[in-house]
Amino acid sequence: MPSCDEGMKLTRRQVIAGGVTTVAMSAAPGASSLAAELATPPPPRPPVVSTVALTVNGKPRELELDTRTTLLDALREHLKLTGTKKGCDHGQCGACTVLVNGERINACLSLAVQHQGDAITTIEGLGTPDDLHPMQAAFIKHDGYQCGYCTPGQICSAVAVLDEIKRGVPSHVQADVSARPRATNMEMRERMSGNLCRCGAYSNIAEAMEEVAGVTPGRRA
């Protein structure tokens, strides 16, 4: 009695016969048109658009946006507020930091439609060349930048950090998270760790923040 393996073996004749059958079927009427139809991709779907109402730098703005649009792209491409920078576009550098209802976020990681009715503050809304925010003035005084690309995000984040400390929001650097945080050099550096400066102006940034916070420069926890 033949084994199962022997029963499953194909002869050369059977392989050739199978190939001929396949060729014949593909040559049948309508086969080529069916293949072409299957190979043609369906037309792209139009984007889903939504109306997004925001308050940006104190002004009400209404945008018709693809629901996939990030807050960063809404600000830069639709509202032309290019002070907010696109760095890594993956939430790892902090260049796109803006304030949403007073809280700092990475605008590249957030969809604009998630912020219906929110108040957005960008670097343009913090101050102007003729009326600088205290943090902007301190960055200039202490050379808290070199190329300047990360500076808008650094300043927005720095403003939010001092507000967090003032409100008593704890951080990982605190030995006792139940204690009220202090605006020390180490505390501020820890909170600013998500904002990268490839030029290495970190010490100057910390000095600028210390001045605005009203603490002795260089004081450590």
Language model features: what each stretch is:
Residues P2-A221:
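Signature of N-terminal electron-transfer/Fe-S-associated modules in redox systems
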